[in-house]
Amino acid sequence: LNKHGDRQYEIAQTHGVVGDYPIKTGIIYDTSVVETKYKAQYHNHPNFSRPSLSQRFIYKDSLEFVLCTNHFKSKGSRNAKGLDLDQKDGQASYNYKRILQAKTLLDIIDSLYFDENIIVLGDFNAYSQEDPIQALQSTNLNRLETVNHSYVYKGKNGSLDHVFVSDNFIDHIDHIQTWNINSIYPSWINYSHNLADSSYFRSSDHNPMVIGVNR
């Protein structure tokens, strides 16, 4: 990013142990727009497949908010047992696990960031009407609606990626959109394949989401 663009980005420095997870979330920020306050914090909990990560930012020297990024358990059935087995209700495997992860995330937010400006986002591996998303929306978190899908699975469009904003911060959001640069393109141009080029298309299997924040 820094080599090919005009902006200067940094990786949020973290506090806390990540553990031995093969996948972890991270936060990259534009130093000309926001500054960090304290180090980013990984939230390790037995219910998480990958620990949640939060960073406190100050936007344009005045607006303070917390960004919390997440990656919930996937829908794959490998090693699923008991309540994590596919219940044939359309929510696939590990729905129970994802519900627990949603509730754990809410407990963390309530404990550490109660009544603060907060944006909660990530790959929740759940569609908008599924139990984990409904659990998150049952609080003071508002899911921001976007027109385009974020993922394609076996030719079917849907959104596994979501953005939630606390009641006291929603007036600072002026737009949200899904940038459709990944999911509609074939996997053989994925960045990890030999046929990949230097464009941003298919840089991931999920589409990024763009949020506009104002003071």
PLM region descriptions:
Residues 1-215:
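Divalent cation-coordinating acidic motifs and surrounding scaffolds
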